[in-house]
Amino acid sequence: MQNLQIREKLALDIILFGKICFPNMFSTESPPFHYEIAALLQDSNNNKLNIIAPRGHAKSSLIACVFPIWHMLTQEGPKFIVLSSKTEGHAVRLLQTIKNALEYSAELRSIYGYWGQHSAKQWARTEIVLKDDTMIMCR
């Protein structure tokens, strides 16, 4: 399968995007509710969502890491993404997960090119500005 075909397929499926680009985050089978969340996230009619699930069910991995990167790489134009959490420390950890994924995922790099620190316009503790002017910040 050629790179463009892979990108087109991944643009339609957040879970598949995560499994391919971040295999270490998807080491077990995704439960059915992850597919429900993904469908809600992919529906452009939903501009506000409140997802509630027990601790340890990979909500943050899917919603605060995989989805922002998927959205950034599969939808046109620069994005403004705010990682909001109860504490700034938790939001910073979420951003660090994104930064690690952008910097170190060989799978992501092979499909979308390099999006890590050396191509970014800003790469700070609480915010990053990527090469396409997408900004991801903590609050």
PLM regions: where:
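N-terminal accessory segments
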Residues: 1-47
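Contiguous, well-ordered alpha-helical segments that form the cores/surfaces of helical PPI scaffolds
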Residues: 35-42, 61-73
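Short, well-ordered loop/turn elements at secondary-structure boundaries
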Residues: 45-46, 77-78, 131-133
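Walker A/P-loop
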Residues: 46-68
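Residue-level preference for the first positions of well-ordered beta-strands
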Residues: 48-50, 80-82, 135
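Alpha-helix boundary/capping segments in eukaryotic regulatory proteins
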Residues: 57-63, 73-80, 85
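Post-Walker A helix-loop "phosphate-sensing" segment adjacent to the P-loop in P-loop NTPases
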Residues: 70-79, 103-107
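Conserved nucleotide-state-sensing and coupling region of NTP-binding domains
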Residues: 84-137
